[in-house]
Every structure is written in structure tokens, then in C-alpha cells.
A protein has these predicted regions:
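N-terminal FAD cofactor-binding segment of flavoenzymes
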Residues: 46-80
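Glycine-rich FAD pyrophosphate-binding loop
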Residues: 27-49
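A short, basic/flexible loop-to-alpha-helix module at the beginning of a structural domain
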Residues: 1-7, 290
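C-terminal helical "tail/cap" subdomain of flavin- and related membrane-associated enzymes
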Residues: 315-411
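Conserved N-terminal helical subregion
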Residues: 6-7, 59, 76, 81-170, ...
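N-terminal Rossmann-like FAD-binding beta1-loop-alpha1 element of flavoenzymes
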Residues: 8-35
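FAD/FMN-dependent oxidoreductases across multiple families
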Residues: 233-316, 320-322, 326
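Conserved FAD-binding catalytic core of PHBH/FMO-like flavoproteins
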Residues: 160-255
């Protein structure tokens, strides 16, 4: 069944973190935005997620007007601690990220976007085709569950529809896939006492080589505990998912205290999480969030990258929507900036995800971090995605790796 054609400045496919951020920020700049979401329920949320937000996203969260809502909802600010077999714990008490379930975050952000003047939320519509004009994207065809097809014409189409992006498939923008040799099981728990660092609950990450685990504290006393296994253990773990998950979590060094805790949700598996990197833009078309770059979830970077890439796209292109040549130049700038900001982190995380033994330089850095706060801070800046992984090759940091220093000694 054919339907109508509607013109917008921007058509955003995917009303999750990246898509809602794009829609609200474009509309605040005066654009008319179609926000297209295949799930009909406005309260829908992503289930398999680490639920951690990096501190680099805080300026975007504040700009959206979301920070106050998160604070009112009781979402904690988080520090971070890391454990490795090469020296034990090192911490980052000044990290100041956010710990929020997608059950809370997604509906809050979607409501915020939908209430923004200039945004038309289209729940229950799926992208089924691209509208093209010579050499560029010019909109999307969408279909609802009754089979009605609607043509949404737009000066800019934004794929914000995740790792397996339908927009990328329809536009034939293929991703570069790097192997991921680990798989994940997540579950929510209530009653796991948070470990505090400088007064904030800490995200805790265990890099066990080759296994891994994480404890992500969230609002309402909920914690997400993640167990990470190398792919060669897939058959064994799937034969006893609950037992394998709990044995790994309970055996962690200084692990979560489960004495008074109960699991409040089912164990959710993510067995295939390929590292996908695709071109961030083409004429009339851009990708944000996981649709542009999907990487190892162990490090909890995905939500932060979604916020940041969405804001970056709007800031580069909002003033150029009325002129195709200016828009394409802005999209090229977005692509260059995206690559410089995110690709080094993607390459570092995807290299770790192949589950090879941690190399001697990484071992040395992790060992030094337990006794040298400068090294710990440098690693923390990389883990928090505040600085490029090249930070660890800074001669001042390299010197501290080569020559051990005690706390209090001069650099």
C-alpha cells in the first residue's frame, strides 16, 4: 500500500541514543527532522548493553538538557577501577562518568527528542528503501506494520540504526569487519554493594587474559555484571550458561559481593559482536553511533561514542543543510574529524578483542599503573577515551615505563 511523500531537512533512522541526539540538536538549530524508529513502543530500550557512559559525553548530555533528568532520576556518577593479573588494581577516582540502565536512558532521551519543536517521531516505521537523486541520497522509504509505505524526502539522511544498519545495507555502504574472538553474557543484579572511589561508585573492569568481566553500577541499586569468554569456550559455556556465568563472576579477584544480592533479570548473551567500521559519510548521507563504528563492548564506550558522534555531525552540518555543495563539504569534514577522534580507539579495542595474550608492553604499563599514578592517569585517559591510544607512546610516559618510579618522585 502506497502512502504520502513528506519533505524534511533531516531524516534520522533509529531513535536510540545517537538518533535522538541528532534529532534534538538539529531541531534546536531550526531543522525539521523525521525521527524514524522501527519499534512501535516509545518506551522500548536496548537490552544487551553495558549501561556505562563515558565522561567525555557529559558536555553533550548537558547540552541536550538530559543531565538534570538523569540526576533527578538518581543516576550515579561513576569512577573506575581496573584489575589485571600483572599487578592488581589501579583506579581512576576522577573519571566522573554515568551509570544508567537503557531502561531509563532510552525512553528519557526519546521523549526529550520527540518533545523538541521540529521533530516528528515516527514509531513503528522501518526503512525499506533509499530515495536517490543523481549522486546522492535524498531520503528514505519507510513501511509500517500494516504495509503502508511512506516516502520521506530529506536533504540529509542519517543512519543511527546500529551495528547491523539497515540504512548502510540499503545504501550499499559496506563496513570493514575485524574479528571479535570473545563473547559476552550480561545480567542485572540488585543488592551488589558498590565499591566507592572518592565518594562515587566505581565501574570495575577485570582484564583476566583471555577472559574478562565488568561491574557497572546503575540507578535504583541495580548493577550490570558482565562475563566475557574467549570464543574457543563457546560450546562449553553454552552447555551451562548460568553455571559458567556465575563461576566466572564469583571467582573474580576482589569481585562483586553477592552475599545479599539477587539476579533480577535473565542472563542475556551477545555471541556475535563483530568490530565494524564504515565510512562515516557519503553525499547526502551520514552514519553515527554503532552504525558508523561498532567496537568491543567490554570497555563500555558505545554510548559515549553515540552521543559524541551525533553532536559532531550536527555541529559540522547544521548550517549547510540548504546547499548541497556546502553540505557535502561539511560531511567530508565530519568524516575526517570522526576518523581522527574515533578510529584510533576502535583499532586499539578491536585489537584487544581478538583475545590474543596481552603483549609485554601492555603488561608493563598495567604493572606500572599500580605504583605510578602518572601512568595510571595516562591509561585512564585512554580507557575513558579522553586521549588517543597514542598517549601511551608519549616519551614522558614511555620513560616512566622503562624506569620505575615510586609515588612522590619527580617526573
Amino acid at each position: 500500500m502506497s502512502g504520502s511523500t513528506t519533505d524534511f531537512d533531516v531524516a534520522v533512522v533509529g531513535a536510540s541514543v545517537a538518533g535522538c541526539t541528532v534529532a534534538r540538536l538539529f531541531a534546536q538549530r531550526g531543522a525539521r527532522v523525521a525521527l524514524i524508529e522501527k519499534r512501535p513502543d516509545p518506551a522500548a530500550f536496548k537490552v544487551a548493553c553495558t549501561h556505562a557512559i563515558l565522561p567525555t559525553s557529559t558536555p553533550t548530555i548537558e547540552r541536550l538538557g538530559l543531565a538534570a533528568a538523569l540526576v533527578e532520576r538518581g543516576v550515579p556518577r561513576t569512577a573506575a577501577q581496573f584489575w589485571t593479573p600483572f599487578g592488581g588494581w589501579f583506579g581512576l577516582p576522577d573519571l566522573q562518568g554515568w551509570g544508567v540502565t537503557r531502561r531509563t536512558l532510552d525512553p528519557l532521551l526519546r521523549s526529550l527528542a520527540a518533545e523538541t519543536p521540529g521533530v516528528e517521531l515516527m514509531p513503528g516505521w522501518s526503512a525499506v528503501g533509499m530515495i536517490a537523486s543523481p549522486g546522492r541520497a535524498a531520503g528514505v522509504e519507510v513501511r509500517d506494520r500494516d504495509g503502508t509505505v511512506r516516502r520521506v524526502r530529506a536533504r540529509l539522511v542519517v543512519g543511527a540504526d546500529g551495528r547491523g544498519s539497515s540504512v548502510a545495507r540499503l545504501a550499499d555502504v559496506r563496513g570493514r569487519v575485524r574479528p571479535h574472538n570473545r563473547f559476552f553474557y550480561f545480567a542485572e543484579w540488585r543488592g551488589v554493594p558498590p565499591v566507592l572511589s572518592a565518594g562515587d561508585p566505581s565501574i570495575r573492569l577485570w582484564l583476566l587474559d583471555p577472559e574478562g568481566a565488568a561491574h557497572f553500577p546503575n540507578e535504583d541499586g541495580i548493577a550490570v555484571l558482565v562475563a566475557v569468554f574467549p570464543r574457543w569456550r563457546l560450546a562449553e559455556v553454552r552447555a551451562d550458561i548460568e553455571g559458567s556465568y556465575e563461576r566466572l563472576i564469583r571467582a573474580l579477584p576482589n569481585g562483586p559481593d553477592l552475599a545479599e544480592a539477587e539476579r533480577v533479570g535473565r542472563i542475556v548473551g551477545k555471541l556475535e559482536v563483530p568490530n565494524v567500521l564504515r565510512a562515516p559519510s557519503r553525499p547526502g548521507l551520514a552514519f553515527v553511533g554503532d552504525a558508523a563504528l561498532a567496537t568491543d563492548p567490554l570497555f563500555g564506550a558505545g554510548i559515549g561514542f553515540a552521543f559524541e558522534s551525533a553532536e559532531r555531525l550536527v555541529d559540522e552540518t547544521a548550517t549547510a543543510l540548504g546547499d548541497e555543495r556546502a553540505l557535502d563539504a561539511a560531511l567530508r569534514r565530519y568524516a575526517r574529524g570522526f576518523a581522527l577522534r574515533f578510529w584510533p580507539h576502535h583499532l586499539q579495542m578491536s585489537a584487544f578483542s581478538v583475545a590474543k595474550p596481552i603483549n609485554p608492553i601492555e603488561r608493563l604499563a598495567m604493572r606500572r599503573a599500580t605504583t605510578d599514578s602518572t601512568v595510571a592517569r595516562a591509561i585512564g585517559q585512554v580507557m575513558a577515551r579522553e586521549r588517543s591510544p597514542a598517549r601511551l607512546w608519549d616519551p614522558r610516559i614511555a620513560a616512566r615505563l622503562a624506569i620505575p618510579r615510586r609515588e612522590g618522585s619527580r617526573a
